[in-house]
Amino acid sequence: MAELRNEVATVKSAPLVPREDFPLLERTVHDRRLVYLDSSASAQRPRSVLDAMDDYYEHSHANVHRGVYAIAEEADALYENARRKVGRFIGAPNPAAEVIFCKNATEGINVVANSWASRHLSAGDVVLVTEMEHHANLVPWLMLAEQIGIELRWLDIDDDFRLDLSDLDRMLDGVKLVACTLMSNVLGTIPPFRRIADAAHAAGAVVIADGAQAVPHIAVDVERLGCDFLAFSAHKMLGPTGIGVLWGREDLLESMPPFLGGGGMIRDVRKDGFTPSELPGKFEAGTPPIAEAVGLGAAVDYLEAIGMDRVIEHDRRLVSYTQEVAAATFGEDLRIFGPYGTEDRGGVISMELKGVHPHDLAQVLDQYGVCVRAGHHCAKPLMRRLGVPAAARASFYVYNDESDIDALVAALKEAATLFG
């Protein structure tokens, strides 16, 4: 084991981008260097994103969509340019109509549940979900089950932490909607989404993809994926909080009623009714998150300058390093939940250290400047499948490197000694 540890330790490289791009990473915690390993919960923001938002507020702040004075037109151009950037980033055929700005991925999924599913599904209809879904892609469907009597059918995971697709065609029999993640926020597993989508469409089902974890880390193209809807959040991809994206096929979005009512989403209002605006406006009621859209556009610019293939390659190198160093250091005392190796896997390491509760572990790591998340990670059905109440999770991004993992492992050793 020691030989493996020494061999692994020599395979190191720098972060994919300069840490100096991220102001928060310059600070210390408990008189130690900050080691941020919680990007699956929320990523840090580069200076370019912060500057873009500041520049908007300092020079172009006004409400969008109706102002005819100069700065209002500037704000409008910035907002719609961000929409175009996002559309290009995910391969949307018609971003001007199909890219809807919302609060976050959770709200995007709820738009589909309330505006599409509630109109197209009825009692007894089946929605297929997976055991590895985040609550954001489970609870809206469970709510519909209570409200209108739909039924949920579950795709389980196998012992290798991948979806069991051995009986996929039978599982899809009679299914009207498939709700599936593009990457598990607990396991890091990347399911064979196109295979699932093709089988779902052959069975006559509509497919929604939860891209909250995947869009920040892998190249996502909605047409190559074969999804009908895609939801994701800005704050996990170097952008600000408070804004997310719902992409949908234009024909499906056209068939859906508005999710929220108010200003901005109407073409006409009468005493006896209203006429909604055209896409995407009918789903963007009220004053939208303008500065946040500008920040998201800047985050897209930053990621595109890196290249998404390089991002996932970097993540996987760190996963491989972590797996090997952890095995060499802790053996069976550290259990990692997720596929071994890097095939079909993203930069998430959820773990259980023998004899240490995940919350205690996270608190000890914090004393060494290491930021990880502990809990059920909004995935309680998956936790029950894994047989644990909670797990500690480290997650990687473009600003991490092997030195961060060395700091994590050193802090884990301290925790093992403390509770041993």
Q: What are the residue ranges of the model-derived segments?
A:
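Pyridoxal 5′-phosphate
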Residues: 1-420
